[in-house]
Amino acid sequence: MTFYILMNQITTMFLGLNLLTTISFDSEIVSYMYGGSKQEIFFQVTNNNRTLAIKPLMEGDFSNLLVITKEHKYYFDLKLTDKNSHQFIEVKNGIASHALSKKVKTKDYEILEGQASILFINNTNKEMMVNNIIVKQREYFSKGVPIILNGKRILN
């Protein structure tokens, strides 16, 4: 799975308790920082410093993760799940796409997908919380990442 991550957006990553998750980057990992304790999650940098392996060691609520590569910084919110966890993630840089096609349409919202981002359109008169960002009308988001609307995972 490929995540096209837009600058300064927090990406939610779902981890499985008995599953190794790898995140591969285009450039070398310089450092990473986890906000929780070492007893919660195992981390190891591999593959010529371009891949970070992650494995939860216990159940619970996890903290956030910052990964700094030679070219960019990436912010992750780590969550434990027993279904649809991420395994192999390739991280690319996202950009706001303008050639878009419809991916999801409901009476309340639409999700349009481009080559390196998605556009979330709010069709209501009320604000929506999407990936911890308030969307009044429309907002670009990283492509490939989970889309969480008002606390519920609706895509990826």
Can you name each region flagged by the protein language model?
Residues 1-156:
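A general "mature secreted/periplasmic domain" signal
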